Design a protein with these regions (language model features):
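A well-structured
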Residues: 54-229, 558-570
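Short linear proline/tyrosine/threonine-rich motifs used for host-factor recruitment
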Residues: 35-37
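Short hydrophobic alpha-helical segments enriched in small aliphatic residues
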Residues: 6-9, 29-30, 42-48
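Post-HExxH zinc-binding segment in Zn-dependent metallohydrolases
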Residues: 353-393
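Contiguous, non-catalytic segments that form substrate-binding/exosite surfaces or channel walls
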Residues: 172-322, 519, 546
Length: 570
């Protein structure tokens, strides 16, 4: 997951905009001068004074009449640097704190983020700032492409905060910090009752914030659009119905097949320190800029960092599961590549991060699945693994690695799920969130419904809450609406791969070589470089030559797993 963009979505985005105040008398004098008014009691003077006394709307109109687009552009550029400074501070606290701070620092960290949020929200939502952005929007034909994008993004960010009381927003930030600490305790002790009250409070706060933003819209629709602009329940219901229609019977066919891949070659105990050495080599093979990269350890893998020149990845390593850290690193490094690949000229602006969580997950899932789980990449990957575990893996072949990593096995843990059953894990969370946000259930009902859905979709019994509803960190951060982007991002990736091959790339040969530069260059020029300047729909259309189509994803899954399991449709 990408913690950096989550902070931006949740805080929207802890932006700081300096107040722009122009004394009304100065404005009056300027207009009077333009109208060649010399006497104080002329009719024109009375007209100007009345305009100033009427309304904020008229003030905005006068600002537009007075403004010089060049002056406003200069103000925007200056303000964007201030936005960046506050964003940098907030992301550094929010990204690194959970990874490196001692436990007792949580309350202080939460208070710091809450106070930053209060100050930033107040300045971002100042009417004068809105007036500046409105003027620039009205004059957008005079702006270059970059400034137009900045104005679009800042107006969107402002609209998500302007009607939310500052106290409500700051209480939410404080609560997420507390809830995250409690979640970790609850997970480690397998005690849902510890976390349940925090979850109920987070749900109620989120609903209250959504009500303040737009009472006419369903809260979950608003949250879904926050994480992937333009989406809602109708969009995702259609998406998941298409996926479920293919995946559910395909899983059943794979499980019934006589051809069953074995995981035994990758079983055993693997030294954790050597796993971290392997992780560092994965950073190299994926082509990250190590001068702009930091690797840490955490309970739940995530990517964060304050800027293009400083991206952090946090992962975990388990002695009994060597593939867990391998694929977590491939995934999180996909997020990191996206952040590092953003146009360097976007530094110090609101464009200097990924455009959405769906797009971000498409990058992480692409390197985890379409590259990392491909048969072609199994050769360079097993060579890398043999380097660090020669005694254990020297006799393991690339095909054995590919087979073990792609074995379809309905399971409990989302992050350890195989590629085929993974979207069902996401579907379960999507349905759970709908029930929570609609009020159909409360936190006390979650474990039972969770177990029911895992039995329904995956046929497994949930033995503990640690392996059930406490396994993911997202709800403790208040990230309702994030989960569906994992499945959507996975689906985006199939369309990228199709487009790469259609343009003449020998995708398998690139993966087999271990030199992923052609893939990085393709994604970099079509996706990464744009930052937030373009939305997902624009990026997919530009990269693939057509709008998003879920059928590329369902066909990819059908073809791949039919071949692995020897099914008739292969």
């Amino acid at each position: 997951m990408c913690r950096k963009d989550v902070l931006i979505v949740l805080g929207r985005s802890l932006f700081s905009i300096a107040q722009i105040t122009i004394n009304n008398r100065v404005k009056y004098d300027a207009i009077a001068k333009r109208l060649h008014i010399t006497g104080k009691h002329t009719g024109h003077t009375y007209f100007v004074e009345r305009i100033f006394m009427d309304s904020a709307h008229n003030t905005v109109e006068l600002n537009a009449a007075l403004s010089n687009p060049r002056d406003d552009i200069a103000k925007l550029d200056e303000l964007e640097k201030k936005l960046f400074a506050f964003n940098y501070a907030a992301n550094e606290i929010g990204s690194f704190g959970p990874c490196i701070d001692p436990k007792k620092a949580a309350e202080e960290r939460g208070e710091a983020l809450a106070i930053l949020g209060e100050q930033i929200q107040e300045t971002l939502c100042d009417p004068a700032v809105g007036a500046l952005l409105d003027r620039l929007h009205e004059n957008r034909a005079l702006l270059d492409e970059t400034h137009r994008a900045q104005v679009k993004i800042l107006r969107r960010d402002r609209s998500q905060l302007v009607d939310v009381p500052v106290e409500l927003q700051s209480n939410f930030v404080r609560l997420t910090t507390e809830a995250n600490e409690v979640w970790e305790q609850a997970k480690n002790s397998d005690d849902w009752s510890l976390f349940a009250p925090k979850l109920d409070s987070l749900i109620e706060l989120r609903k209250e914030m959504c009500q303040a933003r737009d009472a006419s819209k369903d809260p979950y629709d608003l949250l879904l659009s926050d994480f992937e602009h333009g989406t809602n329940r109708e969009f995702y219901n259609t998406f998941f119905n298409n996926v479920k229609e293919v995946v559910v019977p395909l899983v059943a066919d794979c499980m019934a097949s006589k051809r069953q891949p074995s995981t035994k070659p990758l079983e055993g105990k693997f030294d954790v320190n050597r796993q971290w050495d392997l992780a560092k080599d994965l950073v190299k093979i994926q082509g990250l800029d190590e001068d702009a990269y930091w690797l840490g350890k955490t309970e739940h893998p995530y990517t964060g960092g304050p800027g293009i020149g400083f991206v952090m990845v946090a992962s975990h390593a388990y002695e009994n599961n060597v593939l867990s850290n391998v694929y977590s690193m491939l995934h999180e490094n996909g997020h990191a590549l996206y952040e590092q690949g953003i146009n360097w000229e976007y530094r110090f602006t609101s464009l200097s991060t990924g455009t959405s969580m769906g797009m971000h997950e498409s990058q992480s899932r692409f390197f985890e699945n379409y590259v990392g789980l491909s048969e072609a990449f199994a050769e360079p990957l097993i060579q890398l693994m043999r380097k660090h575990f020669p005694g254990q893996l020297n006799r393991v072949t690339a095909f054995q690695l590919f087979s073990a990593a792609n074995k379809v096995q309905p399971s409990l843990i989302r992050t350890e799920a195989d590629e085929l059953t993974y979207p069902l894990h996401i579907l379960i969370r999507y349905e759970m969130e709908q029930a929570l946000l609609s009020g159909e259930i409360t936190a006390k009902d979650v474990p039972a419904l969770w177990a029911e859905k895992y039995k329904q979709y995956l046929g497994v019994t949930v033995p503990t809450n640690t392996e059930g509803a406490l396994q993911d960190v997202h709800w403790s951060w208040g990230e309702f609406g994030y989960f569906p982007t994992y499945a959507l991002g996975s689906a985006y990736g199939a369309q990228y791969k199709h487009a790469m091959i259609a343009e003449g790339m020998d995708f398998d040969a690139v993966c087999a070589s271990g030199d992923l530069a052609p893939i990085r260059e393709w994604l970099g020029s079509r996706i990464w470089t744009w930052g937030r300047a373009k939305d997902s729909k624009e990026l997919i259309l530009g990269a693939c030559g057509e709008p998003f189509d879920v059928h590329y994803y369902t066909k990819y899954l059908t073809d791949k797993y039919s071949r692995i399991y020897g099914l008739a449709s292969a």
